[in-house]
């Protein structure tokens, strides 16, 4: 454990998140205040407060338009992205565009607010950080955060920014399947048998990754990775929701689509049915008064569910084939197939995968919901210098998921770094001018596998100016690509003759939050946090005065006190209690000090009378009323 306190590992998921810490030589996956080891990645805004996690998900049907989830499907993407546009059809909340970036729009405390996906994710991260702090009994400053292996550069950078907004020092961004491989590898430590080829099949709530690693003596080397950053359990839910909404329309001639609350209740029922279908062959759905007073009772079979998602399920095998090709391995050379992510519990997916590998047994030894956070916690411990023997000789060699290069004449993509190159890495290539006396070159950086840049993703661009006039082909411009351990790219271009250089951290110029934006969001996050705390204190003060009032009322109405308290005193207390109860009904939203003041007012009336009780019945004892209530003394 370092002097800075422990570092945590956070699996920031599309639908659920999970946090772990490595201490005393083992990983603890930390339960939240509800006792759950995973926390919904949900943030809700109401007239009075902001809710995160279980509390947010539990009220989603009552407040569908202001409850945000799936931020991971927005993060690092542009508003025009086809996936964003198609997701918006399923989301009950509003997504708007600001400078080409998507933002969610909600009503909070009576005002319209908009948030970037990074801000929503940072709220979920804040919740995970607080869960860890409650368990560890102290502040947490540093964390390793995981992302899908197939996340591109902008999605990685945006996730890192979310961590910064939370106030965390993000030690490293690591890939989810790699983190899961650590969990698997540590679990198997000490088993004999040298190098092992392991395929991690990670299908979660919103993303899908396949990674192939070789594991030997604590060295985890990723050979290839493939996936789909937009495929997961949510998509299987969507198929069922559409199917059942159609059935409702057929049976009852009513379309529930415009009613967001009805759609949300149907989605919750579908999610539950989907889980049931992993262990049973049929699930019943019963929703009272789904729409316009009509109950919806139906059932769905496992076979029907599999048919609705047949294409999506089959589609999970394509990345498996691609990863095998890239790793130059035959499927017979894979020794272990490890399942990660909640959606791998679906029997059909297990069957397809097992059949693809000619009936080979799948490895289900690690917890699919917790493995990623487990691995992240181990990596966090290594990065802060934990000296436990279990993690000392552990080495992670990860890869970049997409080829990176620049545009050359004619819109051709010239890759400098090929996909599945081990990171960190640095590659330099020399380019030259295209026309005589050209004084500047535009360096445009792309990621992707297509031959022409127009089909790939532009990460950013910059000019290198001041090139001395010369015939075409003479100047030598050296372009260097440097990828750090987070998988984030830096590019420099230098003119060899003048030594002039220009550089850019590809943190996606177009989509990236500026430093000022991030600083502003850090302050806002602090402000929201203190507002949340103030609200918690306010509610506590309200509850305190409420319970005090009812307790006092019960006390004086108790039969046992008959004859010990005069009717006049009793009525005085009961009248005051009733007055406070009426005031509370009218002032549910008062400030903390108003509640405290009300409680003091009530105490001023009650304490002298209650003290008299303790001093021997009506009028007994000369206890002064100003003593401020009963004091307790030790009896010898």
From Swiss-Prot:
Keyword line: ATP-binding, Chaperone, Cytoplasm, Cytoskeleton, Differentiation, Methylation, Nucleotide-binding, Phosphoprotein, Spermatogenesis, Stress response
Residue stretches of biased makeup (Gly residues): 616-628
Modification Phosphothreonine, positions: 408, 414
Cellular component terms (Gene Ontology): CatSper complex; cytoplasm; cytosol; meiotic spindle; nucleus; plasma membrane
Localization terms from the record: Cytoplasm, Cytoskeleton, Spindle
One Pfam family hit: HSP70
Signal peptide: none
Region (Nucleotide-binding domain (NBD)): 2-389
UniProt region (Disordered), positions on chain: 613-636
Positions with a binding annotation for ATP: 13-16, 72, 205-207, 271-278, 342-345
Modified residues (N6,N6,N6-trimethyllysine): 564
GO terms under biological process: cell differentiation; chaperone cofactor-dependent protein refolding; protein refolding; response to cold; response to heat; spermatogenesis
Phosphoserine found at: 403
GO molecular function, one term: heat shock protein binding
Chain segments carrying region Substrate-binding domain (SBD): 397-512
Family statement: Belongs to the heat shock protein 70 family.
Comment field on protein domains: The N-terminal nucleotide binding domain (NBD) (also known as the ATPase domain) is responsible for binding and hydrolyzing ATP. The C-terminal substrate-binding domain (SBD) (also known as peptide-binding domain) binds to the client/substrate proteins. The two domains are allosterically coupled so that, when ATP is bound to the NBD, the SBD binds relatively weakly to clients. When ADP is bound in the NBD, a conformational change enhances the affinity of the SBD for client proteins.
NCBIfam families per record: PRK00290.1 (NF001413)
Role summary: Molecular chaperone implicated in a wide variety of cellular processes, including protection of the proteome from stress, folding and transport of newly synthesized polypeptides, activation of proteolysis of misfolded proteins and the formation and dissociation of protein complexes. Plays a pivotal role in the protein quality control system, ensuring the correct folding of proteins, the re-folding of misfolded proteins and controlling the targeting of proteins for subsequent degradation. This is achieved through cycles of ATP binding, ATP hydrolysis and ADP release, mediated by co-chaperones.
Assembly: Interacts with FKBP6. Interacts with ZNF541. Component of the CatSper complex. Interacts with RABL2/RABL2A; binds preferentially to GTP-bound RABL2. Interacts with SHCBP1L; this interaction may promote the recruitment of HSPA2 to the spindle. Interacts with MOV10L1.
Protein known as: Heat shock-related 70 kDa protein 2
Species of the source: Bos taurus
